[in-house]
Amino acid sequence: MDCSLLRTLVRRYCAGEENWVDSRTIYVGHKEPPPGAEAYIPQRYPDNRIVSSKYTFWNFIPKNLFEQFRRIANFYFLIIFLVQLIIDTPTSPVTSGLPLFFVITVTAIKQGYEDWLRHKADNAMNQCPVHFIQHGKLVRKQSRKLRVGDIVMVKEDETFPCDLIFLSSNRADGTCHVTTASLDGESSHKTHYAVQDTKGFHTEADVDSLHATIECEQPQPDLYKFVGRINVYNDLNDPVVRPLGSENLLLRGATLKNTEKIFGVAIYTGMETKMALNYQSKSQKRSAVEKSMNTFLIVYLCILVSKALINTVLKYVWQSEPFRDEPWYNEKTESERQRNLFLRAFTDFLAFMVLFNYIIPVSMYVTVEMQKFLGSYFITWDEDMFDEEMGEGPLVNTSDLNEELGQVEYIFTDKTGTLTENNMAFKECCIEGHVYVPHVICNGQVLPDSSGIDMIDSSPGVCGREREELFFRAICLCHTVQVKDDHCGDDVDGPQKSPDAKSCVYISSSPDEVALVEGVQRLGFTYLRLKDNYMEILNRENDIERFELLEVLTFDSVRRRMSVIVKSTTGEIYLFCKGADSSIFPRVIEGKVDQVRSRVERNAVEGLRTLCVAYKRLEPEQYEDACRLLQSAKVALQDREKKLAEAYEQIEKDLVLLGATAVEDRLQEKAADTIEALQKAGIKVWVLTGDKMETASATCYACKLFRRSTQLLELTTKKLEEQSLHDVLFDLSKTVLRCSGSMTRDSFSGLSTDMHDYGLIIDGAALSLIMKPREDGSSSGNYRELFLEICRNCSAVLCCRMAPLQKAQIVKLIKFSKEHPITLAIGDGANDVSMILEAHVGIGVIGKEGRQAARNSDYAIPKFKHLKKMLLVHGHFYYIRISELVQYFFYKNVCFIFPQFLYQFFCGFSQQTLYDTAYLTLYNISFTSLPILLYSLMEQHVGIDVLKRDPTLYRDIAKNALLRWRVFIYWTFLGVFDALVFFFGAYFIFENTTVTINGQMFGNWTFGTLVFTVMVLTVTLKLALDTHYWTWINHFVIWGSLLFYIAFSLLWGGVIWPFLSYQRMYYVFISMLSSGPAWLGIILLVTVGLLPDVLKKVLCRQLWPTATERTQNIQHQDSISEFTPLASLPSWGAQGSRLLAAQCSSPSGRVVCSRWESEECPVLPLHPGLPHKARYGCCRSSLEMPT
């Protein structure tokens, strides 16, 4: 054994097999293999405890504080707080410490509570009882004590305690059914298969007698991928090696169904299970708003440093004159006079930093997080986005990208299952040029369709009849369909009846396969079932044919085909293969290729999904060679997928073409309307699909991506066969630039309205040539730039024959182009996950191809039509709200701090604060925080119906329109202007002591309180003026926050607080309000402060209105006209009356406008004076108007 171990080490590290460290070896039942067997290096594995919590009782405080102070804003305010503690600063440490303490405490309580819930869930899971096999008997232990190598028994409706290799079940065929709803959301039953050599072990003693080792890959989070092999030792013979795949793996979290019990061996436990590995979140995506917010913070940080530096310099300039540095009432001590000048200057600089630090809003981060978290529920609560048929509603997997939904410039969408229903219906099949459709049967004979007779001029004959039946057998055998037989039931141990063809219900992860099997059933051949590795079909003579299933060459999106190897009762071995025409035709050496290709292209143009079917007969020697090739690839632990692909390539060649099938996939409801609305919103839509060009092109026309006026440009393999890639790209570039002229960012993002209507079609092979390096070793960047130049001048792009990674390449190419547009990817299948993860926003459609797309997406919706409301309504609102929140926070903090800066010029730069400590502390926490939070949750600047009806409003917020530098500078200067009004208005009004009742001048605290009062009123009323959508909650919060400020000030200044060391605010607020000039000053200053913003909005709405502002004006006029008496409406002019009569003439003298269904309703011409709402009346209900 030692020599064997040494040999293993030498081979592993000296013979180039170092990659083997990526695998693990497991002794089943902890039994070592017999003497002489291969030795393995023992490894240490974790126990089966699941720990999803982040903290423990001991490390919660230090770890949570460390995580929170990793955020730059929190760390910044911590530094400010420490500076206030260390040096003599003008403000109390409470002013910075209390807000920081509040933010840290709220976050810690929230995270602590969430972690406590995780602890409870972990304990319940770890203490769950599990049945082990130990010395041939069942032993019950807690789940956390399970170890790798233990043999476990799981009963029906129990959850698997760890990741298990399926050894056996009570079923004779060695299968079991599981549901994985807790893992991927799929509630359908999935079939898993036991190891071939262990499926007969039905008792504890049988399983305990097993001697085997399992070699498998190290843990990785992909739920649908697993590579391993099992070595079963029988006596002293060489071990039997069997491959292990995902069909043999039972995942922790899945539930056993319709199976009494199973036995399995633990291979991944605890935090190494796939379920635990999927706890880790996806890579963090950052929205454009968040990036802008961080940029603005840096700007304000620079302003803060500049203010502190200017005041420090001016302080020493001012103190340079005699007696200013040391007045008679504040003489310095000897030690103070001898202090280093630079040290004093640095200390003063820090003190000014503390004084002005409130320009950085500490509460903005908390408010933004609350707004995103609470706002995300508006999507999940939206009843319009709930699908009754599926019983599913939208899902929000992250709330960090809500506002990004309002910034999308490119949409990349899958076709099958996203634009289409993925509900396949068999239409026809073509066998050697003859076309067959269901139900065309006469006297038991299948007749060719009349539309296909002209393709050949003779009947099939005897040879054709054989090929015809061989074609139907190929369809019945080449698939992975399961049969749910109502007569057979689930009890396989009892007597079985022969299944009735009419009672068969087919189940498959691929709707295409179900449609094909059901289609040939209507043509006379019925697939019955797979039993004991034999496939049974019922032919048109009602005889049951049995074929032994020898091998399955599974489908993958790269090969685009699948095959089966079967053996008939007469001993003949066949390989049946079906797949895409581009995948089958190059491997065909015999058959009527031209006739079949012609029919395939015709069906593709009609939008049908096509597959080609071929076969070849294998000699026993050929089958043995194929078996050895497949077995070698299947048991490989390294590069198994690559080796299998090479083996498939060797086997699937020299085929005989049988024919082709056509399946219809209907377009989803309102898919065309959704794409049309998105294009009107200025969003470019690209379709990325694996289908052939003709099929995808027909779908694009059906969904209005391409129109009759669209000039299609092709960049396909067929085109490249005629010209070089360089020539094709330059020709296309000249074509699109001939009418487009110079390119702008608007043309790139699809927002240009004068773009020529070009459509581009590119296939996967052409994209590979564009993306790969040049033959001369130079970069292919120039090809990419040419390609992007063509794409940015096309209104729509179709990418066909795309592999999953190519979809992600396309998204990445556009995402990182020089314009950096915001991208969105939407799909429903596992092949769409790569592009969903690559795009700025990923949306999964909850479809029929599983939940992988929905699980890996940022948002999930039931149907493609729901994308319209998600972007045009929710995305629009989210962006408007969050951008206003960010700008408003900076604005109100400029208003807050700039008077403090101005005050230093009147107090000798002594760092005297203008506001009381309580006001400094509560300004951002209590007085001004709730109104903007409610605004950012509930604001609707235009109605929901208007946004859905007019998609062009989406253009007004495109390209981060509300957070550009121009808008940011406007808000900043507005804050500076208001601060100047507050400070100097109060200063000049109360500079003359005659305006007060008793002739005394206001003190600095009364002056500061007056400025603060005007400021709170102005910033709150500014928000009220910006509010378009009022509810009782808005009224309560806005006016309630003002009343709270007044009540607090009365209480704070009306009581002598014994715990305070000072009483400087006593009677200040009451004294201020008792002065008539103070009331006059408040009213005047608030009015002047709001005036510029009001004037700007009035002038812009009248002179340079945006589309949104025009819509708001129309809505305002409509609301007024609802109360206008009918007699006051403008009369119809003669010209308008004649026009109306001409348009509305009909034989009955009436015009009837019916309810809108699927086509555009003609809009009746109305007099300009009529209310705007009347324009849409005919679309809502039947309307009759006399001529």
From Swiss-Prot:
Catalytic residues identified in the record: 414 (4-aspartylphosphate intermediate)
Changes seen on gene knockout: Conditional knockout in afferent spiral ganglion neurons leads to age-progressive hearing dysfunction characterized by abnormal auditory brainstem responses and normal otoacoustic emissions. Outer and middle ear function is normal.
Topological domain ranges for the Extracellular compartment: 83-88, 319-349, 906-917, 990-1003, 1054-1071
Cofactor: Mg(2+)
Tissue: Widely expressed. Expressed in myoblasts. Expressed in retina, brain, liver, testes and kidney (at protein level). Expressed in the inner ear.
Listed transmembrane segments: 62-82, 89-110, 297-318, 350-372, 885-905, 918-937, 968-989, 1004-1026, 1033-1053, 1072-1096
Annotated positions of the Phosphoserine modification: 740, 1148, 1158
GO biological process: in utero embryonic development; positive regulation of myotube differentiation
SUPFAM superfamilies: Calcium ATPase, transduction domain A, Calcium ATPase, transmembrane domain M, HAD-like, Metal cation-transporting ATPase, ATP-binding domain N
Keywords annotated in UniProt: ATP-binding, Cell membrane, Endoplasmic reticulum, Endosome, Lipid transport, Magnesium, Membrane, Metal-binding, Nucleotide-binding, Phosphoprotein, Translocase, Transmembrane, Transmembrane helix, Transport
Residues where Mg(2+) binds: 414, 416, 828, 832
Chain ranges on the Cytoplasmic side, renumbered to this chain: 1-61, 111-296, 373-884, 938-967, 1027-1032, 1097-1138
Site (Cleavage): 457-458, 493-494
Family: Belongs to the cation transport ATPase (P-type) (TC 3.A.3) family. Type IV subfamily.
Physiological role: Catalytic component of a P4-ATPase flippase complex which catalyzes the hydrolysis of ATP coupled to the transport of aminophospholipids, phosphatidylserines (PS) and phosphatidylethanolamines (PE), from the outer to the inner leaflet of the plasma membrane. Does not show flippase activity toward phosphatidylcholine (PC). Contributes to the maintenance of membrane lipid asymmetry with a specific role in morphogenesis of muscle cells.
Official protein name in the record: Phospholipid-transporting ATPase IH
UniProt source species: Mus musculus
Designated gene of the protein: Atp11a
